[in-house]
A protein has these predicted regions:
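Non-catalytic terminal/interface segments that mediate subunit docking, oligomerization
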Residues: 338-390, 394
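Active-site metal-coordination/substrate-binding segment of hydrolases
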Residues: 66-148, 153-164, 319-322, 330-349, ...
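Short beta-strand-to-loop capping motifs
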Residues: 60, 209, 268-272, 369-371
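A short beta-alpha structural unit
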Residues: 18-22, 254, 267, 301-314, ...
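Single conserved hydrophobic/aromatic residue that forms the stacking wall/gate
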Residues: 434-443
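Fold-level recognition of mixed alpha/beta catalytic cores in primary-metabolism enzymes, strongest
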Residues: 136-228, 240-241
Length: 443
């Protein structure tokens, strides 16, 4: 049966994408798509170079008369995100993607389409194939494992490239040119905490801060959305300041390093006679929180629920551990730390208190930081490390992603924008990404 993509324009682009979408290419399993691209290059006499990670560079000779032009690198990645609906029977390791054309949209049937970044790879191949395109020397850089680890970008052997100008073909918005991106780093910690039995006459309660919007710690950090961990900490501290003797059994909030926590749950113990007063403090805090965050988190709620008294809720943090924990959560930075001095409206540096998880012998913390200026990124990491260590926590680091500092005066940016306006009759939108995954690939 003929593919519905083959009649679409521009034909070369869709012909290449049609070939790509039929090839299984999960992250870390790019062998078949790599072979497909390599065969395409060999059939045309293009030189192919590979590095140890499996990324490849295809050298495309210049058209006649353009041999002395600068080499341009066209970059994309070979793998795709593999997700399917629960009612779809599909094996991404052995099957290609079934597609349909719905008006102006190309869609997959119950699975991800793989246009990220199959369409970018197809565009580079079509560009090299089109006899009417006049160009200088080209290098098509196709990296591996972008979606699950950026392995190809991080392990790229620069010796397989000769060009100095790179155009990344893995973006989402029509009419947008991206000129910079934040780098990122995670700082994790573990704080040991001793326990004791709760006081006689005390009862367990669950404090829930929920209903917040959360969101991506890069894209949404500028909106100043509430952090449920921070807010739950404030409720407990407010109760202590009000003279209520609150013991903490556990605090758990957040789930992912790159997400703003939407919920946080704290199990506490307090004297039964102080329960109404504690509820009053929580209600007052909720009023304050709505005054601060109603524009971003209108569904925020603070709830106090009584719990069954059992052995698990009777083992509370000792007072020293409780106070260290609350001071730590209160002190860890969260939100926008600085705005760019060069690009109006751009977040330059931020921090995200992402996860707190109570374990038997202590508490685990996950924090993430972003900046388009690498010295600022490492300064935040050092500051967060100092805060953890002052609380007696041990610290560990994940690998950082390098940032890509924006340069509004970049000659290639200006040339690209001029060409876009000449071809499409309108000015492109010049954008910046505040997510770290793209920085590693483009920077």
């Amino acid at each position: 049966m003929s593919s519905p993509l083959l009649d679409l324009e521009p034909r070369l682009l869709w012909q290449h994408f049609d070939g790509i979408r039929q090839i299984p290419r999960p992250s870390k399993h790019e062998e078949k798509i790599s072979e497909h691209v390599e065969n395409w290059a060999s059939e045309r006499g293009f030189e192919v170079r590979k590095d140890e990670a499996g990324s490849m560079v295809i050298s495309v000779p210049a058209t006649e008369g353009r041999e002395n032009a600068e080499t341009i690198i066209l970059q994309g990645h070979l793998d795709m995100v593999c997700e399917k609906n629960s009612d779809v029977d599909h094996d991404f390791m052995t099957q290609g993607i079934e597609v349909e054309v719905d008006d102006d949209w190309v869609r997959a049937k119950g699975t991800t389409l793989g246009a990220d970044n199959g369409i970018g790879l197809a565009a580079a191949m079509a560009f090299a194939d089109d006899p009417e395109v006049v160009h200088g020397p080209l290098e098509i850089l196709a990296t591996v494992d972008e979606e699950t680890g950026l392995t190809g970008a991080k392990m790229l052997d620069p010796s397989i490239l000769s060009g100095k100008i790179l155009l990344n073909l893995d973006t989402e918005e029509d009419g947008a040119i991206y000129m910079g991106c934040a780098g990122g780093a995670d700082t994790d910690a573990f704080m040991r905490a001793s326990r004791r039995r709760g006081l006689l006459g005390s009862v367990p309660v669950k404090l829930a801060v929920r209903g917040l919007r959360g969101g991506h710690s890069g894209l949404n950090i500028i909106e100043n959305r509430g952090n449920a961990i921070k807010l739950a900490t404030r409720v407990i501290q407010a109760a202590l300041y009000a003279g209520i003797d609150v013991d903490v059994v556990s605090i758990d909030g957040g789930s992912k390093h790159n997400a703003i926590p939407r919920e946080c749950f704290a199990v506490c113990r307090l004297d039964k006679g102080a329960l109404d007063e504690f509820r009053g403090v929580a209600a007052a805090c909720a009023t304050d929180f709505h005054e601060e965050f109603d524009a971003t988190d209108p569904d925020l709620e603070v709830v106090v629920e009584e719990m069954d008294d059992d052995e698990a809720t009777r083992r509370v943090l000792n007072i020293h551990a409780r106070d260290r924990l609350l001071r730590l959560l209160d002190s860890l930075p969260h939100g926008v730390l600085s705005m760019s001095r060069e690009v109006p409206g751009l977040v330059e540096t931020s921090a995200n208190l992402a996860v707190v998880e109570t374990q038997e012998d202590g508490l685990k913390f996950v924090t993430s930081h972003r900046s388009s200026v690498m010295p600022a990124l490492f300064a935040v990491r050092r500051s967060v490390t100092s805060t953890f260590r002052q609380a007696g926590a041990s610290v560990s680091y994940d690998e950082h992603y390098p940032g890509w500092k924006p340069n509004p005066e970049s000659p290639i940016l200006k040339r690209t924008a001029d060409v876009y306006e000449r071809v499409f009759g309108e000015q492109p939108e010049i954008c910046l990404l505040y997510t770290s995954d793209a920085a590693d690939e483009r920077g």
